[in-house]
């Protein structure tokens, strides 16, 4: 009698696990409601989420059209490069991320004055390059190169590496989706600077 009960209990447990595991696995890979497979940032967002680099903004949303803040970017960089952030709330984790990203040399001191501000393209790309150890050489070092501002030099390299479009504006604010694309590219591609 005990054997029958044990076998029945074991069979029920196996059946329950068989039903739960595929559902849990598909839920983990399902992505975000506001990032359809047709979105330019889909592959990048899914990659960053699977690697636990990027979280959504709640309610199964990533908010790819929302502007990325200094705090959000700093936390993503810390997670991507294995730098620990501390805190029990998002505010604490964000603050810790900014401090750690500054310590690593990925953000400059202005990040402390406006951690909740959106980031412009040249600052975000410069930060991504700093984290990935991608050098940015002045354009005057190249044959026929003209003198450019720091921001324009950063975007020049970003364009050469395929991280920015030819018409990208150095001062344009970056969305969470665009930031995901840039970070995904920096993490998964190898770059050759000539």
Label each PLM-derived region with a short phrase.
Residues 52:
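Phosphate/pyrophosphate-binding loop motifs in nucleotide- or prenyl diphosphate-using proteins
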């Amino acid at each position: 009698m005990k054997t029958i009960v044990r076998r029945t209990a074991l069979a029920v447990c196996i059946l329950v696990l068989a039903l739960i595991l595929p559902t849990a696995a598909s839920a983990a890979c399902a992505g975000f409601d506001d990032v359809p497979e047709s979105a330019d940032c889909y592959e990048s967002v899914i990659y960053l989420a699977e690697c636990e680099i990027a979280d959504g903004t709640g309610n199964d949303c990533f908010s790819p059209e929302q502007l990325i803040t200094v705090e959000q970017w700093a936390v993503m960089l810390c997670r991507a490069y294995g730098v620990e952030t501390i805190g029990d709330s998002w505010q604490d984790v964000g603050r810790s991320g900014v401090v750690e990203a500054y310590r690593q040399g990925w953000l400059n001191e202005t990040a402390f004055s406006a951690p909740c501000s959106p980031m412009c393209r040249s600052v975000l790309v410069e930060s991504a390059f700093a984290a990935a150890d991608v050098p940015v050489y002045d354009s005057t070092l190249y044959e026929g190169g003209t003198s450019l501002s720091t921001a324009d030099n950063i975007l020049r390299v970003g364009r050469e590496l395929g991280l920015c479009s030819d018409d990208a504006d150095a001062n344009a604010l970056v969305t969470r989706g665009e930031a995901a694309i840039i970070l995904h590219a920096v993490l998964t591609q190898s770059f050759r600077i000539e």
